[in-house]
Structure formats: structure tokens, C-alpha cells
């Protein structure tokens, strides 16, 4: 089973009622003993699109409220609005009677849209200043064996050479580098879908957010379906 197929399997949720689902988090997508935030986003994203009448999330936000353990979770979906062109709702991730995470999203049907595409933008200049062959595989095991989180092993992640902080000499002047991490992300075996994008949104260091809120990292993602690559 390839990476893409494993990811899709890890998102399989069991329906208990019209708007309630259960899942045992897949430990391949953990950070230590807790599920990775991007994986949780993808799981809640899947639950939302399973309930709302529109198939594709066009905007979403997530709040991490409490720690989640490697135990069964319940996903409760509430519909806010269901219109002709869009619908919206919220997913509450519950464990041991605690609401641990919420995911709010608005959905539409991209596959039915026609006409001018005004969303396409050019790639950032940084993707042209180094050849892709110069990018470095994300591997924290070079610091300490076993330090690379399990979720990183579920995809290919190549970091821009200027952002490979773990390979810098200890006496390097860090002020000469931007506080950013640009990378090519690839989940071999399939074309990136909307759930991959939710997963990718919390892949690259620094951590985007935790239960205390956003940590000030601005993300920009593009995807190239032809080579199964997400670039962030």
C-alpha cells in the first residue's frame, strides 16, 4: 500500500448516526503520543463533507482546545447553513466527554464551476532560486535517532537548502536566515485531494498552532497534481 492509500485508509470514519462518526486515530500520524494536528484537520474535514450537501471545503478554520490521546474519538457535525451554492457547518472532536478540537468550514462544488478561474497565482520567487535537486530530505534523526515524528515518514518532504536548520553549524549566525520553511511535499500514489491539503497545512516547522492559538507562522501552499506534489 502506497503513502496516498495509507492516508486515505487513516481517514476512514465509521458512521454512527446521520451526523455522528467514530474513529480510532492512526498512530502513523502521531507526534509522540498525540495525533498530528494536520491529520486531525483532515479527519474532521472528511466528516464535514460527509454530512454537508456540497463536496468540497473552500474555507476552513480549526481550534485545538485540549490534548487528544491514542483512544477512540467521536466526531459530531452540526450544519449551520445549507444553500444552493454553498453550505457550512462545524465538527466537534470529542474524547472522554471533552471537546478537544473544532473544525469550521464552508463547502461548495468546485467540479460544477465553469468560466474564468481567478484563483490561480504564480509560484513564489523562492521556488526558482534553487534547483529541486538541491532540496534536502527532512530528517531530524540526524540530531537524535528517532526524533523525526511518525507523520513525517508518511510522505516525502524536501526542504529548501536555506531552511535546513538542523544541518547548520552550532556557531552559525541565525539572523542571516528568514524564519520560514519552504518545501516540496509529496504523498506518492495519488493526486493531492482536499484532505491532503488539510494534512499539509500543519506539516512544516515551526508548528502552526496549538491549544493556545496561532504561533505566527504564515503558510502558502500550491499543488501540482501532475507530479503529486504539494509545495509549501
Outline where the language-model segments fall.
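Terminal targeting signals and extreme-terminal segments of soluble enzymes
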Residues: 1-223
Amino acid at each position: 500500500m502506497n503513502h496516498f492509500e495509507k492516508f486515505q485508509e487513516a481517514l476512514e470514519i465509521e458512521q454512527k448516526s446521520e451526523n455522528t462518526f467514530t474513529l480510532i486515530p492512526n498512530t502513523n500520524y502521531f507526534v509522540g503520543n498525540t495525533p498530528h494536528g494536520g491529520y486531525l484537520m483532515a479527519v474532521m474535514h472528511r466528516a464535514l463533507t460527509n454530512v454537508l450537501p456540497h463536496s468540497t471545503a473552500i474555507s476552513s478554520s480549526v481550534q485545538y482546545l485540549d490534548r487528544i490521546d491514542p483512544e477512540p474519538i467521536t466526531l459530531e457535525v452540526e450544519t449551520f447553513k445549507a444553500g444552493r451554492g454553498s453550505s457550512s457547518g462545524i465538527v466537534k472532536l470529542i474524547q472522554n466527554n471533552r471537546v478537544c478540537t473544532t473544525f469550521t468550514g464552508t463547502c461548495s462544488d468546485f467540479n460544477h464551476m465553469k468560466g474564468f478561474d481567478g484563483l490561480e497565482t504564480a509560484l513564489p520567487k523562492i521556488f526558482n532560486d534553487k534547483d529541486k535537486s538541491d532540496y534536502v530530505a527532512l530528517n531530524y534523526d540526524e540530531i537524535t535517532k528517532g526524533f523525526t515524528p511518525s507523520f513525517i515518514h508518511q510522505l516525502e518532504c524536501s526542504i529548501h537548502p536555506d531552511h535546513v536548520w538542523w544541518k547548520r553549524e552550532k556557531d552559525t549566525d541565525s539572523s542571516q536566515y528568514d524564519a520560514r520553511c519552504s518545501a516540496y511535499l509529496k504523498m506518492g500514489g495519488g493526486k493531492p485531494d482536499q484532505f491532503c491539503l488539510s494534512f499539509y497545512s500543519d506539516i512544516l516547522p515551526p508548528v502552526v498552532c496549538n491549544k493556545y492559538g496561532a504561533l505566527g507562522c504564515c503558510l502558502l501552499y500550491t499543488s501540482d497534481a501532475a507530479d503529486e506534489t504539494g509545495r509549501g
